[in-house]
Amino acid sequence: MRVLEEDLRNGYIRILVEDIDDLWILFMVLRKGDIVYARTSREVKPGEGGSSRRIPMVLGLRVEAIEFQEFTEKLRIRGIVVEGPEEFGVKGHYHTIAIGVGDQLAIVRETWSKHSLDILKKGVRRRRILLVSIDYDSACIAVLTEQGVKHHSEIQSDLPGKMYRVEHEEILDEYLSKVASALNNVIQQEEIDAVIIAGPGDLKNKLGENIRRDNRKHVYLDTTSTGGCQGISELLGRDVVKQVVGDLSIVKAKEVVEEFKRLIIKDPQLVAYGVDDVYGAVVYAAVSRIVVAGDLLHEPDDERRARVYEILEKAYETGAEVIIVPGKSDVGLEVQGFGGVIAVLRYRLFRGEHSP
């Protein structure tokens, strides 16, 4: 989750949803009476006798109900339209906005409780993604954080024409070496989680090889029409950024699963798995880290699904690290083998201490 704008004096917070975990945080934070603004579409009839058509628009809803849409990764927010385009006469009518990963929404509430703000703050993950856009003219280096994009530097190539072949190759090698050195410095200084290198030609591949060799970081390559800082702007609009954020959650989940598997053999009182066992642990505020397979959120049994929701709510309330992964991913399938949810505990719980 990224907080794009905050004005608590006027009760206003604007948020970017980065992964499914964020949808669950919003599910717990949103409440009846909130005003939510988001881009949506609505079927309207422009004039007398005309055929209706679906038109994109930004609407403000007074929230009446919030739910997860079955079998999709969307949060459905239903309410009465309080603000929207006057020409379509939508005010006062009911509407449902579906929020998914990559969407933005603004929430307006008269007074934000400390509890709600704490939950939102826990959802802001401190991810740092290094962005590089390179071509034969220049390379731009920037870091994407929750606060936005911070530009570090732009390096010019100063390449001579290709008619000076030997000199061209030497200066090209120096250029790549200079960019790689600058990247390695930023990686060390900024505690980077992943690197995205983009550009129109083959230079991104050569640079990517250098960075992979020098660092144990996840390096992603993508194609943009230009390099330099203009290429960074183009890169931010591409799906690869969303993919990287999702992959980082998978990497974190794998770390928790490996720790869980190690502890279940060496110290089984420090883990819990399965809905009932994890629920018992979370009630005691014993859960430190928890991984949930996404399929469990769509459990057809109402009572069992409600128990899963309780686990998530109590985990967030007690400061546990919560990671939700796709059920069909490798790590998701592994978690499903343990009942769909696993937890690493803060302290030992002997099974007689809590009833399933």
Swiss-Prot record:
<dbReference type="GO" id="GO:0046872">
    <property type="term" value="F:metal ion binding"/>
</dbReference>
<keyword id="KW-0255">Endonuclease</keyword>
<keyword id="KW-0479">Metal-binding</keyword>
<protein>
    <recommendedName>
        <fullName>Protein pelota homolog</fullName>
        <ecNumber>3.1.-.-</ecNumber>
    </recommendedName>
</protein>
<dbReference type="InterPro" id="IPR023521">
    <property type="entry name" value="Pelota_arc"/>
</dbReference>
<comment type="similarity">
    <text>Belongs to the eukaryotic release factor 1 family. Pelota subfamily.</text>
</comment>
<dbReference type="InterPro" id="IPR042226">
    <property type="entry name" value="eFR1_2_sf"/>
</dbReference>
<dbReference type="InterPro" id="IPR004405">
    <property type="entry name" value="Transl-rel_pelota"/>
</dbReference>
<dbReference type="GO" id="GO:0070481">
    <property type="term" value="P:nuclear-transcribed mRNA catabolic process, non-stop decay"/>
</dbReference>
<comment type="subunit">
    <text>Monomer.</text>
</comment>
<dbReference type="GO" id="GO:0070651">
    <property type="term" value="P:nonfunctional rRNA decay"/>
</dbReference>
<dbReference type="InterPro" id="IPR005142">
    <property type="entry name" value="eRF1_3"/>
</dbReference>
<dbReference type="GO" id="GO:0071025">
    <property type="term" value="P:RNA surveillance"/>
</dbReference>
<comment type="function">
    <text>May function in recognizing stalled ribosomes, interact with stem-loop structures in stalled mRNA molecules, and effect endonucleolytic cleavage of the mRNA. May play a role in the release non-functional ribosomes and degradation of damaged mRNAs. Has endoribonuclease activity.</text>
</comment>
<dbReference type="Pfam" id="PF03464">
    <property type="entry name" value="eRF1_2"/>
</dbReference>
<dbReference type="InterPro" id="IPR005140">
    <property type="entry name" value="eRF1_1_Pelota"/>
</dbReference>
<dbReference type="InterPro" id="IPR038069">
    <property type="entry name" value="Pelota/DOM34_N"/>
</dbReference>
<dbReference type="InterPro" id="IPR005141">
    <property type="entry name" value="eRF1_2"/>
</dbReference>
<dbReference type="Pfam" id="PF03465">
    <property type="entry name" value="eRF1_3"/>
</dbReference>
<keyword id="KW-0378">Hydrolase</keyword>
<dbReference type="InterPro" id="IPR029064">
    <property type="entry name" value="Ribosomal_eL30-like_sf"/>
</dbReference>
<dbReference type="GO" id="GO:0070966">
    <property type="term" value="P:nuclear-transcribed mRNA catabolic process, no-go decay"/>
</dbReference>
<dbReference type="Pfam" id="PF03463">
    <property type="entry name" value="eRF1_1"/>
</dbReference>
<dbReference type="GO" id="GO:0005737">
    <property type="term" value="C:cytoplasm"/>
</dbReference>
<dbReference type="GO" id="GO:0032790">
    <property type="term" value="P:ribosome disassembly"/>
</dbReference>
<keyword id="KW-0963">Cytoplasm</keyword>
<dbReference type="GO" id="GO:0004519">
    <property type="term" value="F:endonuclease activity"/>
</dbReference>
<keyword id="KW-0540">Nuclease</keyword>
